[in-house]
């Protein structure tokens, strides 16, 4: 008689991110842009529960516990999904992979500029590594993560990091002091490629030569290390912001409202449309989030830095 199959579930959470700084170089011949960015992992997490299945193959579903309103949102559940791709890569690396079902709990906005899909992929890498006893080191997982997308290695790493190249060359930054933010979510997404194309168009129309970014402003890292939101508020930068606002002009109003109601500064997070408002402290963040919510916005107080992908449970069923 064959050995009886016992299903096992490994649950992993991985954080979304805010780009505290994002400088974007000119369009390269390969179609990419070089960037210099400071990533901050924040306390808004995706979760992936990877369950071994007796039948081979990879299946994906979205958990009913997801806090996002996903009506009308097209999330592919096949090989186009980053979590699916991550599981497929791990299956190739593992000696005895089983089938696997991935249940994703969505909390980070889809196409919101916070790396939600990348967090799903990072969580899946870690979950499948544990599920199939692959024994890969964090460094090996990070190498696989880079194959999946520029933001995936950071969600695996977490904390604060400087990203160069296309964002994939990561250097951890020793900045552990808590910074408090209010995230304002939109009820629509912005395509990252569309935002970059819009930026290229704006720059072409201006005829200004854009230098390649080689590093980030050291003042940003100093402010993060010291936990100094006042200084940080003066040096926030996002080269994609004007492109995002060109595509969604209402984002400017949201930033203005946040700053008028007490935020030290506001910016588009990554390619948007999520807005990140920097608060003086956790109390200020909570008050601001509550006020914006009363005004009809979908707002949430978060903090960072937080750790990267972590196993939160491992259960034999």
From Swiss-Prot:
Keywords: ATP-binding, Isoprene biosynthesis, Kinase, Nucleotide-binding, Transferase. It holds the Pfam family GHMP_kinases_C. HAMAP family: IspE. Belongs to the GHMP kinase family. IspE subfamily. One of its GO terms (molecular function) is 4-(cytidine 5'-diphospho)-2-C-methyl-D-erythritol kinase activity. It comes from Paenarthrobacter aurescens (strain TC1). The gene is ispE. The lineage of its organism: Bacteria, Bacillati, Actinomycetota, Actinomycetes, Micrococcales. The keyword Transferase applies. This is 4-diphosphocytidyl-2-C-methyl-D-erythritol kinase. Catalyzes the phosphorylation of the position 2 hydroxy group of 4-diphosphocytidyl-2C-methyl-D-erythritol. Pathway: Isoprenoid biosynthesis; isopentenyl diphosphate biosynthesis via DXP pathway; isopentenyl diphosphate from 1-deoxy-D-xylulose 5-phosphate: step 3/6. The active site is at 17, 151. Its EC number is 2.7.1.148. GO terms for biological process: isopentenyl diphosphate biosynthetic process, methylerythritol 4-phosphate pathway; terpenoid biosynthetic process. ATP binds at residues 109-119. It catalyses: 4-CDP-2-C-methyl-D-erythritol + ATP = 4-CDP-2-C-methyl-D-erythritol 2-phosphate + ADP + H(+). The keyword Nucleotide-binding applies.
């Amino acid at each position: 008689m064959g050995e009886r199959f016992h299903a096992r579930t490994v649950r992993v959470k991985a954080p979304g991110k805010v780009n505290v700084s994002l400088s974007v170089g000119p369009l390269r011949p390969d179609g990419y842009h070089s960037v210099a960015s400071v990533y901050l992992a924040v306390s808004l997490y995706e979760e992936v529960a990877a369950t071994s299945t007796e039948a081979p193959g990879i299946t994906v579903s979205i958990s009913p516990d997801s806090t996002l309103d996903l009506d009308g949102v097209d999330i592919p559940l096949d090989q186009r999904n980053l979590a699916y791709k991550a599981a497929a890569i791990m299956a190739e690396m593992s000696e005895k992979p089983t089938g696997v079902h991935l249940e994703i709990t969505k909390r980070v906005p889809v196409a919101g500029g916070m790396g939600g899909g990348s967090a799903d992929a990072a969580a899946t890498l870690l979950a499948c590594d544990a599920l199939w006893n692959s024994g890969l080191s964090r460094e090996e997982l990070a190498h696989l993560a880079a194959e999946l997308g520029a933001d995936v290695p950071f969600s695996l790493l977490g904390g604060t990091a400087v990203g160069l190249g296309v964002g994939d060359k990561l250097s951890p930054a020793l900045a552990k002091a808590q910074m408090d933010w209010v995230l304002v979510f939109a009820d629509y997404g912005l395509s990252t490629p569309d935002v970059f194309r819009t930026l290229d168009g704006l720059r072409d129309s201006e005829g200004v030569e854009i230098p390649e970014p080689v590093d980030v402003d050291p003042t940003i890292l100093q402010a993060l290390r010291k936990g100094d939101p006042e200084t940080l508020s003066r040096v926030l930068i996002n080269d994609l912001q004007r492109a995002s606002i060109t595509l969604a002009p209402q984002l400017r109003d949201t930033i203005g409202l946040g700053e008028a109601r007490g935020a030290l500064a506001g910016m588009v997070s990554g390619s948007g449309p999520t807005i990140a408002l920097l608060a003086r402290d956790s109390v200020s963040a909570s008050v601001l989030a509550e006020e914006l919510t009363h005004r009809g916005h979908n707002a949430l107080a978060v903090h960072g830095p937080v750790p990267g992908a972590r196993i939160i449970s491992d259960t034999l069923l």
